[in-house]
From Swiss-Prot:
PROSITE patterns: RIBOSOMAL_S7. Part of the 30S ribosomal subunit. Contacts proteins S9 and S11. GO terms for molecular function: rRNA binding; structural constituent of ribosome; tRNA binding. InterPro entries: Ribosomal_uS7, Ribosomal_uS7_bac/org-type, Ribosomal_uS7_CS, Ribosomal_uS7_dom, Ribosomal_uS7_dom_sf. PANTHER family: RIBOSOMAL PROTEIN S7 (PTHR11205). Pfam families: Ribosomal_S7 (PF00177). The gene is rpsG. It comes from Rippkaea orientalis (strain PCC 8801 / RF-1). One of its GO terms (biological process) is translation. GO terms for cellular component: small ribosomal subunit. It comes from the Bacteria. This is Small ribosomal subunit protein uS7.
Length: 156
């Protein structure tokens, strides 16, 4: 790892359709092999589908889903005298959003269904309703942190 100081974080430009940074970040997560236009098509199809199914603004549903999926705490491995402890740590907002998007896209991919856009739309709607695979992952992360609360004093 380089010791030359911190890298400057580049801001994510908002997407052209919804003017949302969150959607732009999701498109980048959905993208495979540099095919951004395909990923954008999948994301916009999913949002259109959400709008039709729920009858409400798809951007609001999506933002609610991400808010529900964002973890507050996570566990990190810390080695102390030959033993490895799972130490609960608070999650920074940027990392929380990144984890939420990662889980959302991962559980959409492994979900049953015909197209990626329909799977993504269903996973987003489930997350907005606090159900689905990604929501289970968030709850599991919180449970792990709660179970290992005794090791919180090893925080670094």
């Amino acid at each position: 790892m380089s010791r030359r100081g911190n890298i400057k974080r580049r801001p994510v430009p908002p997407d052209p359709v919804y003017n949302s940074r969150l959607i732009s970040m999701t498109i980048r997560r959905v993208m495979k092999s540099g095919k951004k236009s395909v990923a954008a098509g999948i994301m916009y199809d999913a949002l259109t589908s959400i709008g039709e199914k729920t009858g409400s603004d798809p951007l609001e549903v999506f933002e609610k889903a991400i808010k529900n999926l964002t973890p507050l705490v996570e566990v990190k491995a810390r080695r102390v005298g030959g033993a490895t402890y799972q130490v609960p740590m608070e999650v920074r907002s940027s990392r929380g959003t990144t984890l939420a998007l990662r889980w959302l896209v991962h559980y959409a991919r492994i979900r049953g269904g015909r197209t990626m856009s329909s799977k993504l739309a269903n996973e987003i709607m489930d997350a907005a309703n606090e159900t689905g695979g990604a929501m289970k992952k968030r709850d599991e992360t919180h449970r792990m942190a709660e179970a290992n609360k005794a090791f919180a004093h090893y925080r670094y």
